[in-house]
């Protein structure tokens, strides 16, 4: 009898522990699905993803894991299947990604690339404006020409800091140089760097702004990131008008990713009415204007 009682007590204890564990499992439910997204640094540095992430996670019971990269690096992660979706802003690189058969069609949009927000690029620089690009109604191309001319003339007060990282912003910068009549590789990246006025940072947008500020240099930035960092910078906006400065954000589901359905949920989420309204007001209380604008078919195009 003495030997039986301890065995019974042990069995009761084991059954109690099992019931507790099973009960906890039932309460907690299954672990959330993991969705990996590579995003541009501008969307991350502005804090937009910090706002969107918890809403998306709660709505879809998902663990959203975000990696902030330049567009070029983000798309490379999409090619290898290291992420399930990318949120980027370089139409030319996006088109190449889709042409390479790395993108999956978004179910509700019947296309691989879905635009969901936009803002504008601006040229910023020191208030002293040694290249003289402000207040003259210059186009972005004309402003770049003046910066190049002054830099090439060894005006030591004129410098330009580039992202230099194959990001969407870097792509836009190269497009402006090309539109201004320059061979980017030879005239800017080569001769400009040799002359010392053109500097490639190789960093994200926030870090590039800080570097340009420290060097009292010009740079190209999306307006949202500039507004988010403006309080800690001496740089000022100098040129902010021109069709070439349009900056459209798109989301693409990666064909080599492993969570298509949840990635498609992200696409639908970003275009949902309540999220579009959130984007329209994001940053207004702090900066007096939005850091991004919601999707507009007349500006961003379809879908």
Predicted segments with their positions:
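Secretory targeting signatures
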Residues: 1-30
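Extracellular/periplasmic juxtamembrane helices and adjacent flexible linkers that interface
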Residues: 28-31, 256-303
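N-terminal segment of the mature folded domain
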Residues: 30-157, 202-203
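Ligand-binding cleft/hinge of the Venus flytrap
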Residues: 52-58, 141-202
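Short secondary-structure boundary segments
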Residues: 90-91, 164, 221-224
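Short beta-strand->loop
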Residues: 104-116, 223, 227-245, 255
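A bilobed periplasmic-binding-protein/Venus flytrap-type ligand-binding module shared by bacterial periplasmic
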Residues: 121-130, 247-265
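Ligand-binding pocket segment of bilobal, Venus flytrap-like solute-binding proteins
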Residues: 174-240
């Amino acid at each position: 009898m003495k030997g039986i009682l301890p065995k019974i007590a042990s069995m009761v204890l084991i059954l109690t522990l099992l019931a507790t564990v099973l009960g906890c499992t039932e309460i907690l439910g299954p672990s959330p699905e993991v969705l990996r997204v590579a995003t541009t640094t501008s969307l991350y540095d502005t804090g937009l993803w910090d706002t969107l992430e918890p809403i998306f996670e709660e709505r879809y019971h998902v663990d959203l894991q975000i990696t902030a990269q330049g567009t070029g690096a983000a798309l490379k992660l999409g090619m290898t299947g290291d992420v399930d979706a990318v949120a980027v802003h370089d139409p030319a690189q996006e088109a190449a990604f889709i042409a390479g058969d790395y993108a999956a069609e978004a179910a509700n949009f019947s296309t691989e690339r879905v635009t969901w927000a936009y803002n504008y690029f601006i040229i910023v620089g020191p208030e002293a404006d040694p290249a003289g690009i402000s207040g003259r109604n210059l186009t972005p191309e004309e402003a770049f020409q003046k910066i190049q001319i002054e830099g090439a003339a060894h005006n030591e007060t004129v410098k330009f800091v580039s992202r230099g990282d194959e990001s969407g912003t870097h792509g836009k910068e190269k497009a402006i140089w090309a539109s201004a009549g320059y061979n980017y590789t030879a005239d800017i990246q080569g001769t400009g760097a040799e002359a010392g006025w053109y500097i490639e940072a190789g960093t994200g947008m926030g870090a590039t702004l800080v570097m340009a500020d420290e060097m009292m240099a010009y740079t190209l930035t999306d307006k949202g990131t500039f507004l988010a960092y403006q309080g800690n910078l001496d740089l000022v906006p100098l040129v902010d008008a021109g069709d070439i400065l349009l900056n459209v954000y798109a989301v693409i589901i990666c064909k080599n990713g492993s969570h298509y359905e949840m990635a498609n949920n992200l696409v639908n989420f970003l275009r949902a009415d309540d999220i579009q309204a959130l984007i329209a007001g994001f940053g207004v209380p702090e900066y007096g204007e939005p850091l991004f604008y919601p999707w507009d078919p007349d500006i961003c195009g379809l879908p």
